[in-house]
Amino acid sequence: MARLKEVYRKEIAPKLKEELQLKNVMEVPRITKITLNMGIGEAIGDKKIIDNAVADLEKITGQKVVVTHARKSIAGFKVREGWPIGVKVTLRSDRMYEFLDRLLSISLPRVRDFRGLNAKSFDGRGNYSMGVKEQIIFPEIDYDKIDALRGLDITLTTTARTDDEGRALLRAFNFPFRN
């Protein structure tokens, strides 16, 4: 079992139950999935860029990646319907907790000029989204073998009903929020 999953069950859930004054431990908010998305607009000119992005995201997550395609043609962006324009992957269960552990303990401290995560990046329903400017903060990526620096979006979907519950959950996981 993943280390953070065990910490959640034994320490975080009982603490949050008391803090949020919930009656049942099943009411305690939990993280259900983590979605990583890499939008690649420059893939229009070169199809190899998608392959490199797929390889990077697969190294980071250890899971097969889905290539996203344009739903409709947009002349202003020179995009045709069905063209690959991004990659995404959804992590659940043990892989999700292992990724979260690596993100919090290894990757975020490697971000240049890191001053903490924005505590206002919640969506109103307890889900948290953050952006990473460079994929090289992850130790799985070899700096010498990347073709370009690419950012990615990370979304943590929780069962929290409000932003305050979601914030309490992520603070319990020791997320480094800015004050």
Curated annotation (Swiss-Prot):
Give an example GO molecular function.
structural constituent of ribosome
Q: Which UniProt keywords apply?
A: Ribonucleoprotein, Ribosomal protein, RNA-binding, rRNA-binding, tRNA-binding
Q: Which Pfam families match?
A: Ribosomal_L5, Ribosomal_L5_C
Task: Give the GO biological process terms.
Answer: translation
Keyword presence, Hydrolase: no
The record ties this protein, via InterPro entries, to: Ribosomal_uL5 (IPR002132), Ribosomal_uL5_bac-type (IPR020930), Ribosomal_uL5_C (IPR031309), Ribosomal_uL5_CS (IPR020929), Ribosomal_uL5_dom_sf (IPR022803), Ribosomal_uL5_N (IPR031310)
**Which GO cellular component terms are attached?**
ribonucleoprotein complex; ribosome
Signal sequence coordinates:
none
Source domain of life is Bacteria
What NCBIfam families has UniProt attached to this entry?
Answer: PRK00010.1 (NF000585)
Oligomeric and partner information: Part of the 50S ribosomal subunit; part of the 5S rRNA/L5/L18/L25 subcomplex. Contacts the 5S rRNA and the P site tRNA. Forms a bridge to the 30S subunit in the 70S ribosome.
Q: Which family does it belong to?
A: Belongs to the universal ribosomal protein uL5 family.
- Protein task: This is one of the proteins that bind and probably mediate the attachment of the 5S RNA into the large ribosomal subunit, where it forms part of the central protuberance. In the 70S ribosome it contacts protein S13 of the 30S subunit (bridge B1b), connecting the 2 subunits; this bridge is implicated in subunit movement. Contacts the P site tRNA; the 5S rRNA and some of its associated proteins might help stabilize positioning of ribosome-bound tRNAs.
Q: Per its record, how is this protein called by name?
A: Large ribosomal subunit protein uL5
Q: Which organism is it from?
A: Stutzerimonas stutzeri (strain A1501) (Pseudomonas stutzeri)
